């Protein structure tokens, strides 16, 4: 994948996360979302955080959550964990739901 393709696909991930948080905040959630360049920080009501950031040199998207640090690479049309193969949005849904204490579903 070229650098241009990576940036387009990775920025789409960040945009999808931002959209989901905006919709969740219209409902029962109160998630603070801060974007600084290619880093998104989600802060939940209990003070816990999830950080999603782009890693252009490696062509990856990373998640840092209470559950740990995870690296995702674009494989066969989806962002997949480099160790487990778990799909990015499925994993983020699990981590955010655990940390928020309320269900929240992320998708592309």
Swiss-Prot record:
It comes from the Bacteria. Keywords: Iron, Metal-binding. Belongs to the frataxin family. GO terms for molecular function: ferric iron binding; ferrous iron binding. SMART domains: Frataxin_Cyay. The lineage of its organism: Bacteria, Pseudomonadati, Pseudomonadota, Betaproteobacteria, Burkholderiales. It comes from Burkholderia cenocepacia (strain HI2424). The keyword Zinc does not apply. This is Iron-sulfur cluster assembly protein CyaY. NCBIfam families: FeS_CyaY (TIGR03421). One of its GO terms (biological process) is iron-sulfur cluster assembly. Involved in iron-sulfur (Fe-S) cluster assembly. May act as a regulator of Fe-S biogenesis. GO terms for cellular component: cytosol. The gene is cyaY. InterPro entries: CyaY, Frataxin/CyaY, Frataxin/CyaY_sf, Frataxin_CS.
